[in-house]
Amino acid sequence: MLTLKEKEFWFVVGSQQLYGEEALQEVKAQAQTVTDALNESGALPYPIVLKDLAINADQITNVMKEVNYRDEVAGVITWMHTFSPAKMWIRGTKLLQKPLLHLATQFNESIPWDTIDMDFMNLNQSAHGDREYGFINARLNKQNKVVVGYWGKSEVQRQIAEWMDVAAAYNESFNVKVARFGDNMRNVAVTDGDKIEAQIQFGWTVDYFAIGDLVQYVNAVKEEEIDVLFAEYKDSYDFDYGDYSKDDWEASVRVQASYEIAIKRFLDDGGYNAFTSNFEDLYGMKQLPGLAVQRLMGQGYGFAGEGDWKTAALDRLLKVMSHNQSTGFMEDYTYELAEGKEAILQSHMLEVDPTLASTKPKITVFPLGIGDREDPARLVFDGKAGDGVVVSMADFGTHFKLLINEVNAFEPTTPAPNLPVARVLWEVKPNFQDGVKAWIENGGGHHTVVSLNLTTDQVVSYAKLVGLDYIVIK
């Protein structure tokens, strides 16, 4: 995958000087035990680093300032081991510009009824501290995540891990750079939008390039480079020659290999991690990039067709959040309306993300009726089954809106021998009629990002962090 820089999360444990040095040393020792256990659990995608105990306002403020300017720190996890007066937290919490998780837990899972005394009560009063601390976060409208339960339980660790992925994506949002090869498809409405507002609100940089800029990179690709990549294709996929001669078929595939090399080189040279294409802007290109785009999506680059920069950026963001697992660009195509079998067939003219493949992809070559270019190569496969979320972003003039529809994807049971593109099928929730109606009434686009790895809660958490209006259909 197109990798992130290494990230870590700081663990800030709240207490106060009132309890005395002996008690504070015990708090710190228990905090270290929790930190070590969480890091050794194997359940968390990023490491936790324990910081000094938060026992006064200056200390809290300084650690939050440091979080902001340390790029490797993706967020803060707090735990109120004892009562920690929340006025101490106001300044630092207001300054904090990264995601915050309040872990409402305590060191002991159970109350030791046989030995409990006031010393134990004073040392272990998270129930007391949680409410004081929770109030100030609510008062500050911090949009922090709250995870409740014993820190050693797998369910609690799962929730922390999912939040970590959201926090990592939030940080990456300010590094999303989209290269647009050509403009939006002419006369299409929903794919357009305010790029300046997107950069202000989400941190996304969106740059236009004429297709000739990419053609220069394509022309510079060496045959030896194509040979190496073609050999990789042979090891990774089945080859379906169809009605083409082997020479003609391989010539088409080699064109796509040159595109993959050129696009990747262009993106990496400019620091871009997402891109768009447009079949109306292909001057100097022999084919519409298909296989090339699919391969790059599989490596973690965000993508959307027809110049749809919002979906390309969202694709990159959700790939980071999901570790590029079963997440990719998609388009609503065709309804299945038979009673009891209602579903939506998802595909695209070429560019369906191979992270969604349930079968070994095959490379095929087939004519493309639009774009007026040579027959392009593409990967064909059937999509995975599983519960997931479908996400679309649209610009409503006064604000962006994110639509989130829960779906159940299933593997097709009927062959489609004449369909020369990958296909994904899903049922929308709560049911076909209400789900589709809600999507249309709320202005959901035909371009989406689907993930069979992420949850609604994760996508909503990101939306809250960036102040993004959202609708959940489930």
Curated annotation (Swiss-Prot):
Gene Ontology CC: one annotated term: cytosol
Phylogenetic lineage: Bacteria, Bacillati, Bacillota, Bacilli, Bacillales
Annotated GO biological process: L-arabinose catabolic process to xylulose 5-phosphate
Protein's job: Catalyzes the conversion of L-arabinose to L-ribulose.
Residues holding Mn(2+): 306, 331, 348, 447
Domain of life per record: Bacteria
Enzyme class: isomerase
This protein's record includes keyword Metal-binding: yes
Cofactor stoichiometry and binding remark: Binds 1 Mn(2+) ion per subunit.
Species: Oceanobacillus iheyensis (strain DSM 14371 / CIP 107618 / JCM 11309 / KCTC 3954 / HTE831)
EC number: 5.3.1.4
Family note: Belongs to the arabinose isomerase family.
UniProt-listed Pfam families: AraA_central (PF24856), AraA_N (PF02610), Arabinose_Iso_C (PF11762)
Gene Ontology molecular function: L-arabinose isomerase activity; manganese ion binding
Protein name: L-arabinose isomerase
Catalytic reactions on record: beta-L-arabinopyranose = L-ribulose
Pathways involved: Carbohydrate degradation; L-arabinose degradation via L-ribulose; D-xylulose 5-phosphate from L-arabinose (bacterial route): step 1/3
Cofactors named for this entry: Mn(2+)
Keyword Metal-binding belongs to the record: yes
Key words, A-Z: Arabinose catabolism, Carbohydrate metabolism, Isomerase, Manganese, Metal-binding
